[in-house]
Swiss-Prot record:
Pfam families recorded: UPF0506
Family the entry assigns: Belongs to the UPF0506 family.
Compartments it resides in: Secreted
Top-rank taxon: Eukaryota
Main location: secreted
Cleaved signal peptide residues: 1-18
Entry keyword set: Disulfide bond, Glycoprotein, Knottin, Secreted, Signal
Record text about domains: The presence of a 'disulfide through disulfide knot' structurally defines this protein as a knottin.
GO cellular component: extracellular region
Residues listed as glycosylation sites in the UniProt record: N20, N32, N48, N110
Origin organism lineage: Eukaryota, Metazoa, Spiralia, Lophotrochozoa, Platyhelminthes
Disulfide bridge positions per record: C116-C130, C123-C134, C129-C139
Descriptive protein name: UPF0506 protein SJCHGC09643
């Protein structure tokens, strides 16, 4: 609401300035009109204009963007800072992955949430790797494979 008032005042000032620079004969009428306008009249006109806005006037892209963003929102308050699978993560508290997902980094504090890390991806703990083995900050192939004979 305050921004609407500021925009309306800014428009009035620009109209006054443009009229003053182009035509000096209308200077007195513009000043009289601006003096007659009170703050309550400005508020009433802004309220009337905002009431006339219909939902169908919004572009379809805005509506679909709002729907897709609503799907990506965390469902509970404790998931406020965590991201779901495929979303951006940075391995920080504010951009961490939810649940058992891990952050696969593509750059410095730039990654994507995945189920587990593939071979030769940056890791800190063995639980992050699909193979279950993290060695020297890289996921390694699990060489300890149990062979079960039937």
């Amino acid at each position: 609401m305050n921004t609407c008032i500021q925009l309306l005042i800014l428009c009035l000032v620009t109209v006054i300035n443009s009229e003053n620079s182009t035509d000096h004969s209308t200077e007195n009428t513009i000043e009289n009109e601006t003096e007659d306008v009170t703050k309550t009249e400005l508020l009433k006109t802004i309220e009337n204009e905002t009431e006339n806005v219909i939902e169908t006037e919004l572009p379809e892209t805005v509506e679909t963007e709002i729907q897709t963003e609503a799907l990506n929102l965390p469902q509970s308050p404790e998931q406020r800072y965590c991201r779901s699978k495929g979303q951006y993560c940075s391995r920080t508290y504010f951009h961490r992955c939810c649940g058992n997902l891990v952050c696969q980094l593509h750059g410095f504090f730039n990654g994507t949430c995945v189920d587990c890390l593939a071979e030769r991806k940056f890791c800190i703990w063995s639980s992050e790797c699909c193979s279950g083995r993290c060695r020297l900050f890289r996921c390694r192939k699990n060489t300890h494979v149990k062979v079960i004979h039937y």
